[in-house]
Amino acid sequence: MSSIDWKQIAEWDKKYNVHAFSTAAEYGTTFIERTEGNYLIKPDGTRLLDFYNQLYCVNAGQNVPEIQAGIKDALDRYGFVWDIYTTDYKAEVSKLLIEDILKDSGWAAKVRYALGGGDAVETALLIARLYTGKPLIAGREHGYHGVSAGAVQLTRMVPSRSFASYESEEAPIKTVPGSVFQNTFVCPAPFCYRCSLGHKYPACKCARADGLLPCVAQTEELIRSHNVASVAAIITEPAYGAGTIMPPPEYLPQIEDMKNRLGILWIVDEVLMGFGRLGAWFGHQADCVTTRPVKPDMMTLAKGITSSALPLGAVVVSKEIADFMDSIRWNHVCTFAGHPVCMAAAKYNLEYLIKNDIPAKSKEAGVYFRAGLEDLASKHSTIGFIGGAGMFWQVEIVKDKDTREAFVPEDRFTTFSGDLSKWPIHLISDAAAEKGVLVGGFVPNTLRMGGACNTTKEELDKVLDALDYAFTHLEKTLL
């Protein structure tokens, strides 16, 4: 039995904390006393198999002894030193990234550390504009790159742009006054299941004589229409995290060809997909999203770089950009970037991932899980599409498989206003939780799932059983 007074904790939590996704009147939370492996453990001892991996970031699993021991050693050695000082941990992590993990990439040269994912994106945008002397950055429909001032300009998920919604469906969403889209523009998403350009994949590959996917062709036209001489970079997720979209495998190679043709930079946002999530070290290397090796100019990292034992972000830059940064005095620093204890977490996490070949384990687990999902799709009429690999999965939930009709018409353009209790993802997640499994999603009709990259077959079977139960519940409720 817990020694913590959780009744008192609940009182303080409700009284003093600002909560996400609910008004004060809607207050309700799940208390977690500890974590273990792939489980969250509640005060009463209930074990919840975490198959959204705390926002897909605990790649090595919870409480890994080697990582925890390394952090404790760093705490014994360090209080704090700031960015201008070098610790052994910082140098070792950079060596692990560039020499060991990215040694065959053909592009990666140096690393700049940041506070987390959004800060890494901010740093990459700053570098892109400084290096090129150009102001504009191209983003994409449904992209998510963070919610800080620069990153949010490229986040094209409506709830993440508007920041606040109301319990009443009739009330307007609360938006930040003024423009939050300065020096950015949006390009089409490679969302084949619901193509905004009206095409069908794979037939769309034959739509043009040059073989360009229509979404890539339209992206290039938009960049040209904004004047290539003013465009610094395009930023893409290798697969969409919050937006939950798996692009076709031709997309990333064609984006690389396009950026080379136009002479712009390509930033790959690997904050969520990095470190084994898609069954490769980085998402842009995964064979589920690319037909060949591709070379970005910069790559943003966070989450899996420490398996979220402690917060850390990073930007990996190419040799050309590294040479440029070596030629200037880089004055953009912050207090906590490269914190020695966070760097220790990264060092011991990366060593663990390398030693245990975690990307390969993720890929193997994904093959097993896909087979289980396909079995479920044959039983449940509401499973319209399955996408994913490794330990990141997208399931489109539909009224009708043939017409692809969504239960919530707004889909990825939802504002999060009104009664959300009948959203398919909430019905699914609530029912799965009854079976001790946590799954979720950010958009109403799309289930987003994935555990630690070393999730076992027994744990995957537990997830599949819970999903079978949950989809049965959904179909009884909504059909």
Predicted region positions:
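Conserved N-terminal phosphate-binding loop of PLP-dependent enzymes in the Aspartate aminotransferase
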Residues: 1-479
